[in-house]
């Protein structure tokens, strides 16, 4: 081609790379989030996982962290359960590593499988939210203050998550969580349903199939749950009525009732005068250096932690999630994270919901729109006790009835639930609402009873293993066996395996298409530049043609770009989808090539260790509880 032609080609190539560089840096695919190995993992094949940050607010560097586990088996259809812990400001890695996830820590370095984990027939998506919680990060000046802000932030996250993982978007979608997630989940559900009604969403056929909500020991209705503290501790014998201390607690309860006795409930999600009731109860139980555990009244804890040091797994989780190899495996942005903490006091101090109504006011509308909701309670939890939840249900009106009325004055019966021959709890249901009371369980029901909680989940999701295989669990309601469920690992039937294979093959092409959109732009720009160059070359060197550039590009004499593209398309499609063959990973470009640049800055944090006391004092109030567990302590 000659020196001038070579120089021209080099110039055009430089221009193309300059134009396409921003796209190649910022675009991410599923491959960037794939967890290749997990430190301390048990023997056996690694579960299919993705983890990392998704930017939801570039202007504030707001990023939410997620950890996704693909279901081990598919029953009759694909389902995704999104799990949120509460706080506000407490990490959903509590749920991942202590409750419903497939792994639990034996010690600071070793993981073990959990029998009864929720990923048997459902994909699990754990999200640290809102911004500032757990591994999530962003400008501290832009932490959310209201519940509708939180819900909007989360919908943005889901939009972006489904762009990267489009093969999960058609799944039946469920939101689950506990404690302050009783505020999060109804607000998020409302935002999702409103989103689905928008014309542009319907036109693009991107409606999310929201199928149900599960809330455990939820903080949902302060109007019913604050006043329930006294009846609960009297009923459980924690406080003796008529004593001087009991009279003091009753005086605080009376003061709280004045705060609650208002027509406009805006701003009543968190009431300091009402929080004093719980603190007075804990003070009453203070004996020596011990006090009752507010999350499990059968236990005690150091005063004034009173449950903040529980569960015992906590002492292993923080060191594990701060290990450099774990941080790397989960694709944590090392420039931003300053060490995982269970609860971020700054998030709780910011999210006071002073202009938000309690989530209980959203429940009737959600139920009337046909959305099934399951509320479950651990019998021995004090902070979000079952007496308050039951009182809330009793007084809630929806679909032409009050509480669990089947008809005027006729209530749905409380049905006895037995699991593997032992009394497990009570079921009660009517008009899309189900309530489950777990006997002898704490604030974190799945921590105590993972297999029973999985049985509850499978019943709610409608999983029936009759045509799948496996040993059924002996679970009965009023002595009757319902759909056959299983809470142990088992093989799928051939038919189910074929359905899963077909789903994953489809997923591969969808993910390839999504991640290839940016590549298409790059190819189009390069093709345009190529065309201009060829046109100019033909004019200048019409006699010699342009074959001489082939060796430079590694092409054959046909000038076909398609052969290189075809050679790599299948392999790239596989790794960018969720369907991974780990033997293919050795053939992929280096991690340095796949890595993405990250912003630098000192104004962002992920709940620095030791910052909680400062966070708690930021609004001028002395926090009731140790900020390491969140101001309300409702994790």
Curated annotation (Swiss-Prot):
Per the UniProt entry, what is one GO biological process?
A: proteolysis
Q: Which residues cross the membrane?
A: 515-535
Keywords annotated in UniProt: Apoptosis, Carboxypeptidase, Glycoprotein, Golgi apparatus, Hydrolase, Membrane, Protease, Signal, Transmembrane, Transmembrane helix
- Residues with attached carbohydrate: 112, 432, 440, 492
The places in or outside the cell where this protein is found are: Golgi apparatus, trans-Golgi network membrane
The residue spans the entry assigns to the Lumenal side of the membrane are as follows 28-514
Q: Which intervals carry biased composition (Polar residues)?
A: 483-495
Active site positions, chain numbering: 179, 381, 443
What is the residue range of the signal peptide feature?
Answer: 1-27
In its UniProt record, a GO molecular function of this protein is:
serine-type carboxypeptidase activity
Catalytic activity annotation: Preferential release of a C-terminal arginine or lysine residue
Task: List the Cytoplasmic topological domains.
Answer: 536-635
* GO CC field: membrane; trans-Golgi network
Q: Which family does it belong to?
A: Belongs to the peptidase S10 family.
What is this protein called in UniProt?
Pheromone-processing carboxypeptidase KEX1
